[in-house]
Amino acid sequence: MFRNIFSIAGFLIALPLLAQTQNLPVSWVDKDTGHRVIRLTDEPGSSGFYFNVNAFTPDGKQMVYTAPDGIHALDLASQKTRLVVPNPPRPADAGSDPRAYFRFGVHTIVVGRKTNSVFFTKFDPDAKQSVIYKADVYTGEVTKLVALPPRASVATINADETLGVGTYDENETPPEQEYGRNRPAPASATGATPGAQAGNLVQPEGKGEMMERRLAARIPVVLYTIDLKTGKMTTLLHSTDWIGHMLFSPVDPTLLMYCHEGPWQKVDRIWMIHTDGTHNILIHKRNMAMEIAGHEFWGLDGQTIWYDWQYPKGEDFFLAGYNLQTHKRTAYHMQRNEWSIHFNLTQGETLFTGDGGDPGQVAKAPDGEWIELFHPQMLNVMEGAINDSDFWQPGVFHSEHLVNMAHHNYRLEPNVRFSPDKKMVIFTSNMFGHSYVFGVEVSKADNLAASDVHSTPELASQFNPTSPTPTH
């Protein structure tokens, strides 16, 4: 319910900061990789969506992102941006607490799969309830859909844009039990500062302890659907597990993926259920102590669920896929330095990408701070080799560095995604201090002038002299 509150550390942008933004570099070629990096947004505190949440319009021409002043759209061809849904004025009674201001802002859910709409919620201070809206990304026209009951949130919209899914606590929850509700706003070092809605992008201080506390609380929750026309709510399940990361299939409007939150080694995380409440299925069942699986996402064709699989935790690394039609399982192996917090892929699954991680992440990678491009290769099964129909099919990633992220503070997760034309990997970074959305071209740059080539960490340090400290 409070997943977006983590991104707030302020609520006003100073004019000198805006002036400084105009001097930030817009484009350069990374000296260490040979790939061109482009800063796509101008707003300090701007941020892309969480890695597995759709940000692109169905026509593939627009990408939605958030900034302190509201919801924006980026034209992918011209790289021009515009404000689509502004944040409302700060309420007079909001006080000095940035959380109070944040509560009344607009909060994105997802970009629709059927229409060029971005779905979002906004709190109605008069009715004292959250309301779901959608806005046309091109015209900005806003349509009010349905109101939510107390304690309820919506996390995803289905493929035909008829249903939302979310959770609510069955009882009022003490603040000390709800994950993140009583924690301080994050330090500005993350870059997710002036009111930007980064949501799951920011790794909070004390995250592990808070997750343990929330899991142990066993708070009764309801997973539900809500009809976006009538407001009718349908219960899918009651649970005292910590339910989160709901994500509808990109093609099947009746199919929902969700997870049991908590320390990964303590939960069976990845689940699938239908909108009639049937076929509640665990996607990955462990068979080793300390085996973990998580950060799940859909393939763009809706046939495969992909996820980070470590066998065991922090020692051996795979990107695993489960095909819902064939029930076949694929595992692409990677090296420690290639592991990433999040992964993503192209249509057709010909290329994958990852956002790397600093030495404080689970992989403890000594040289993992890169935006990576992965070329997948399935391994040949030798003639005569035993290959049961239930066996994992093995593959390997061949990695290519795209961006040197050594000056990025990984407490803000980059959350990579490919552009629809597969020509660019898009990510969020605070390398310049405040967060911005960047792109890096998949193809290497050519015909370069020497003045165009820079070390990304050295360039970033000119504008942000503070060196990042590893997460832990």
Where are these regions (language model features)?
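Blade/loop signatures of beta-propeller domains
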Residues: 20-38, 212-224, 386-392
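A short helix->beta-strand "capping" segment at the edge of beta-propeller domains
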Residues: 28-48, 395-405
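Conserved beta-propeller blade repeats
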Residues: 46-64, 89-121, 149-169, 238-259, ...
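Structural motif
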Residues: 70-73, 127-133, 173-180, 213, ...
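Short loop/turn segments that connect beta-strands within beta-propeller blades
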Residues: 76-79, 136-140, 227-231, 274-278, ...
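Asp-box/WD-like beta-propeller blade repeats and closely related beta-sheet repeat scaffolds
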Residues: 90-222, 231-238
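Loop/turn-rich, solvent-exposed surfaces of beta-rich toroidal or solenoidal domains
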Residues: 305-308, 312-317, 333-397
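Blade-level signature of beta-propeller repeat domains, shared across WD40, Kelch, NHL, RCC1
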Residues: 412-472
